[in-house]
Swiss-Prot record:
May play a key role in the regulation of the intracellular concentration of adenosylhomocysteine. Its cofactor is NAD(+). Pfam families: AdoHcyase (PF05221), AdoHcyase_NAD (PF00670). It comes from the Bacteria. It is found in: Cytoplasm. GO terms for biological process: L-homocysteine biosynthetic process; one-carbon metabolic process; S-adenosylmethionine cycle. Pathway: Amino-acid biosynthesis; L-homocysteine biosynthesis; L-homocysteine from S-adenosyl-L-homocysteine: step 1/1. This is Adenosylhomocysteinase. NAD(+) binds at residues 195-197, 229, 258-263, 281, 316, 337-339, 382. One of its GO terms (cellular component) is cytosol. HAMAP family: AdoHcyase. Binds 1 NAD(+) per subunit.
Length: 468
């Protein structure tokens, strides 16, 4: 599907002719991303990322293009790939390629191409990456497994199509550039991780004592998880379902699996669209929150009998099984808004009849003739069937990413090989950079008031343990 359009150009995109279209949308997005634009103004002259060679793996969207160009404006060199085979916006990738930035991303790329492109973003010729910006942990795992294998650790036996292509691509890279990933890992100053799933991977690696460089958990910055995960999903989920199916949500019964920040936003999105919403949960605290918000909390076994629309938002695997889908009502809509495609047992449906209605929307027919609708083949529905979160909320997330990259690159000696979150004063800074755009006016504490509650007049205003 994808090919390098000119051997002299260091990119793979669907159509470089889309660059002007992409550039026009990037200009619009910049007006909705005040945090990133403020960082360009603040740090453009000092170039804090000069010398940084960032391997980036994150959805190649218009909003990500603004992030990439902010990193470059602050002095970094960047090589970029998407972190999901369906999430690329081809005009965004074309605009980045036309700007001379190496990018490897095509909407609908195969799993083989996906992992080959991960290899491409680590190939810096005679140099190596010295920073990683990741979403989901795939780039980090590629580098770490490469170094482990070269150190003599056996590579795991793949158990699914994704792992088969990962192992193949990694072996081919190691054969082509022996010792290179070991050298890369040694030079990497740190990784900033965007999403819940990738953060879980990092904490597990750190727990096992195998994290070779510091990591910043961007996901758990308040201005990421409580905004991108919550308010972003609140707008983008229903947008995706409507684009994919043209279904009327009002009056439908929907089930959201998981009531974390993403699940909360998803449930609110469906309720806002007029659906009656049920929630499934394993955690008694989240279940109680859902109940107090007025959602009916049920098991999936009950939900499949009653619901018309199903959304997984857990970060787990096998949340909706083949047996669940067999029990659903005809023409039920099934989709996922968690990072990976493990939440719905898509592979268990492979032997059934699939009919593509349009890209991202498939009818799956069971042996008894019943059909259900699968969106984005179980991958991220808001990016597979629509354009993801709005620019403004992504500005908040990506401002955290840029600050994390600056922090790790310029203050590397202050960090151990552990997983950190950004300090509270930077979290508050990210929020502050987005207030003017919304016409927000902050109240100023008097010295007496600040002393009374034990904070500085300039902040931080909350202790680290405060739950927003």
């Amino acid at each position: 599907m994808a090919s390098v359009l000119d051997a002299q150009n260091d990119y793979v995109v669907a159509d470089i002719g889309l660059a002007d279209f992409g550039r026009a949308e990037i200009r619009i997005a910049e007006t909705e991303m005040p945090g990133l634009m403020a960082l360009r103004e603040e740090f453009g002259a000092s170039q804090p990322l000069k010398g940084a060679r960032i391997t980036g793996s994150l959805h190649m969207t218009i909003q990500t293009a603004v992030l990439i160009e902010t990193l470059v404006a602050l002095g970094a060199e960047v090589r970029w790939a998407t972190c999901n085979i369906f999430s690329t916006q081809d005009h965004a990738a074309a605009a980045i390629a036309a700007a001379g930035i190496p990018v490897f991303a095509v909407k609908g790329e195969s799993l083989a191409e996906y992992w080959d492109y991960v290899g491409s973003i680590f190939d810096w010729g005679d140099q190596t990456a010295n920073m990683i910006l990741d979403d989901g942990g795939d780039a980090t795992m590629f580098a770490l497994w490469g170094a482990r294998v070269e150190a003599g650790e056996p590579l795991f036996e793949p158990s699914n199509a994704e792992e088969i292509e990962f192992v193949r691509a990694l072996k081919e890279f190691l054969k082509r550039k022996p010792g290179y990933l070991t050298m890369s890992v040694a030079h990497i100053k740190g990784v900033s991780e965007e999403t819940t799933t990738g953060v879980h991977r990092l904490y597990q690696i750190a727990k096992d004592g195998k994290l070779p460089f510091p990591a910043i958990n961007v996901n758990d910055s308040v201005t990421k998880s409580k905004f991108d995960n919550l308010y972003g999903c609140k707008e983008s989920l229903v947008d995706a379902i409507r684009r994919a199916t043209d279904v009327m949500l009002a009056g439908k019964v929907a089930c959201v699996a998981g009531f974390g920040d993403v699940g909360k936003g998803s449930a609110a999105s469906l309720r806002q669209g007029g659906a009656r919403v049920m929630v499934t949960e394993i955690d008694p605290i989240c279940a109680l929150q859902a109940a107090m918000e007025g959602y009916e909390v049920v098991t999936m076994e009950e939900a499949v009998q009653r619901c018309d629309i199903f959304v997984t938002a857990t970060g787990n695997e096998d949340v909706i099984t083949a047996e669940h889908m067999k029990a659903m009502k005809p023409m039920s809509i099934v989709c996922n808004i968690g990072h990976f495609d493990s939440e719905i047992q898509i592979s268990a449906l492979n032997n059934y009849k699939w009919t593509e209605i349009k890209p991202g929307t498939d009818l799956v027919e069971f042996p008894d003739g019943k059909q259900i609708i699968i969106l984005a083949k179980g991958r991220l529905v808001n990016l597979g069937c629509a354009t993801g979160h709005p620019s403004f909320v992504m500005s908040s997330s990506f401002t955290n990413q840029v600050l994390a990259q600056i922090e790790l690159f310029t203050k590397n000696a202050e960090y151990k090989n552990e997983v950190y979150v950004l300090p509270k004063h930077l979290d508050e800074k990210v929020a502050a950079l987005h207030l003017e755009k919304l016409g927000v006016k902050l109240t100023k504490l008097s010295k007496k008031q600040a002393d009374y509650i034990g904070v500085s007049q300039e902040g931080p205003f909350k202790p680290d343990h405060y739950r927003y």
